């Protein structure tokens, strides 16, 4: 072997070791992520999004599950629609729930669906889920409330705490700041208790008032965008009154699926028992995020018309 050949061999050997070290380092980093061993996620939509589209489900994975290590850090995974509450064959499994404008009865019905869907996943795949390989359950807005309600029922059914991991965006039931723990007191201070009670009852919200995401039942990661008038209802109310909340409802609360991975990463993280809060900075292009969420990533294409019609049906007939 010539001197040049020996030199090239040494370079190749060093490169090989560097590559192996890089792979091992990457694997160790992933092993620390809460969803590193999870390869199945149940995906639910928010209000007026009863059946998340493929674009919705993949955006949820790319932006909010991928940073937690889901399915080895996968993006663009295949999507299937669950048959009722029965599992289907894809990493991202879409669960259809009502997601009506009347969030009280709608959330309670969706909570029943979540419980059945989780039970059916465990029954169909005995031994598939564990602390190392948890079943992931994703919720946005109203469905985060439904999943929060479902947690106590799942615990009562004997589903082990470490076998599930919930991931929420725009959680209305976020302790201290969310809309459901705070709206009654805040509206009372502006409108008086009589009018507040009438409005909340007429809009079908009374069934979820005071609901809080449990911090002691199942590991939960909650992403909140600064200014979100639902997840950060209390801060918006204190800084801008009801108009601040309304703006945050129709602007930041809509933008989650239109964020970029870099914007999601621009966040501060804190823990509260089993909850990990990821607070995302609003230092973004709001117009781009809003338009991308609505028209590219499924916010307007996940059953909007069906949900509105069902909401009208419920308003007229008290059933859906």
Regions found by a protein language model. Give the residues of each.
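Secretory targeting and sorting signals
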Residues: 1-31, 166
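Short secondary-structure transition/capping motifs
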Residues: 27, 103-107, 136-140
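Surface cap/lid and interfacial helix-loop subdomains adjacent to catalytic sites
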Residues: 33-130, 153-320
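Gly/Ala-rich beta-loop-alpha elbow adjacent to hydrolase catalytic centers
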Residues: 137-152
